[in-house]
Amino acid sequence: MKNIALIINDLKGNGAERVVITLSESFIALGHSATIICFNDFIELPVNKKINVLSFNINRWRWIPRSLRGRVVSYFLDRFILRKIGAPDLILSNLLPVDRIMCESKLSNVNLVVHNTMSSEYKFNLDLIENFKHSEVFKIYSKKPVICVSQGVADDFKSLFPLHEGCNQIYNPINADLIKTYANECDVPYKNYIVHVGKFKREKRHDVLIKAYAKAEIDKLLVLVGQGALESEYKALVSQLNLTGKVIFAGFHSNPYPLIKNADLLVLSSDFEGLPTVLLESLSLSTPAISSDCPSGPREILPSNNLFPQDNIDKLAEFLSVPDYSIYKTELPDKFYADTIAKKHLTKA
């Protein structure tokens, strides 16, 4: 039996957090021990009772200068891990706030999981690669092996770290059976609708989706599932385009699967992604899905006929205007199933 630790800031309802839970469930199903360690006691998502969830309060070290904090906190985190679960056979560190600490860890087999295209997320200009080499991000991700969640993320990483020898690509997992169970847990108050699931962040490009929806003039609701800093801005845009009552701001749902299952179509309109879990969830529920052909991930999940040019309102409006969304229906590829992905991670333990 392998002892696996997955470390993340919290368990809010975002893609990386869902992936950590799914991976933990898969490790346990295969007969191994999985522990999730969070830096904050913020849990919005349902967590299997078989998963050991521990809290490591990072806030007590906020007073330490940032230049020293990583080394100091990693020392105490290493001791915390050894005391609570013993020496892990595999450690998966997720997202920059955690990677900033775990890159300094003295424990063995620490892997930093890269969930997004760094050149897009951190706005790095590859023409200024020498400047990038002096950045904090470069220093963090040069210190440990990394696991990239899609081939697009891996290609982007290698362009930024051409000399890094520890870059591996393993897809994010999807537990299709569990998602189908969750999808039947409650009724949906909407009918005849298109759905988007994601935080109201600039890179998700809700503005493109809302404008394309207005241009398409279709007799369907647009249901936006999520929350975030830009929500008020997008509500103002909806009002400006006279779409009040047609665009529904449904808020955050810890279980969005009934809304995905009962939708006529799921849309992703992002400027960039890592491996968009929501597309995998949509396919597992047999809901047609379309996406911007953004870097990276969508083209590794969907056929080309389901991809529209990034930041193209007119083309997205065309996709929304087709009379039958079943043309966008596609099967979930086997390579994304959770047990397959968990076994790939275990080869590194």
Give residue spans per PLM region.
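N-terminal strand-loop element at the rim of the active site
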Residues: 6-14, 18-22, 26-68, 153
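Short His-centered aromatic/hydrophobic patch
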Residues: 92-99, 114
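A charged, aromatic-enriched C-terminal amphipathic alpha-helix characteristic of glycosyltransferases
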Residues: 15, 325-349
